[in-house]
Amino acid sequence: MNIELVKKFTKDHLKGEKTGHDYYHGQRVANLATKMYLSDYPDAHKDSRIVAIIQTESYLHDTIDEKICDNPDEVIDEIKELLPKGGFTSLEIEDILFIIQHMSFSANIEHHYQLPLSGQYVQDADRIESLGAIGIARAFTYGGKHGNKIYDPEIKPEKLISHDQYRNHVETTINHFYEKLFDLEDLMNTPAAKKEAHRRTE
């Protein structure tokens, strides 16, 4: 499996991204997801196919994110062309595409998708990236880029019940912590992630 092709693809597509969803976010997610998987499965080899799949999903997940991608369907078609060149099987490609299209927080507000094991680690790592020091930095970077206020007592946190509400409601960066980030610990899938999310939330 040629992960370098995936890394280059991600770098090219996220070049200039400045809201905390750049190539280096994908790299951190890949490193953390791999670390957590190997912690939960100590007999697994770091060069196994599932680790390569975990890293691939980690790097690719934000290349199709509607927050930063104007045409996700077009990028999905590019990924379908890319992955066979990297040595992935048709079944692996099917899983990778399902995971990167269904792992986001917004995709799971109205319906919870049960992801294959690799996707559970990537989803957990992506959410953990929103916690702790790096998570705070990313939240304020994203809020500033989109012109959100840091705090406004007249704008109350909302209970998120739909994708459209999540994308379109008026929020402040402080509210984002109460609407989403403080609840992420309870959404973890895997043993290692539950421990790390608890540590960062505390």
Segments predicted by a language model, with ranges:
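An active-site-proximal "capping" alpha-helix that borders the catalytic cofactor pocket
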Residues: 29, 73-85
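Hydrophobic, well-structured mid-protein blocks that either form specific transmembrane helices
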Residues: 89-123
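Short alpha-helical hairpin
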Residues: 1-11
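Divalent metal-dependent phosphate-bond-processing catalytic cores, especially two-metal-ion Mg2+/Mn2+ enzymes
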Residues: 14-23, 27, 31-46, 60, ...
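His-Asp-centered metal-binding catalytic motifs of divalent-metal-dependent phosphohydrolases/nucleases
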Residues: 47-69, 75, 97-106
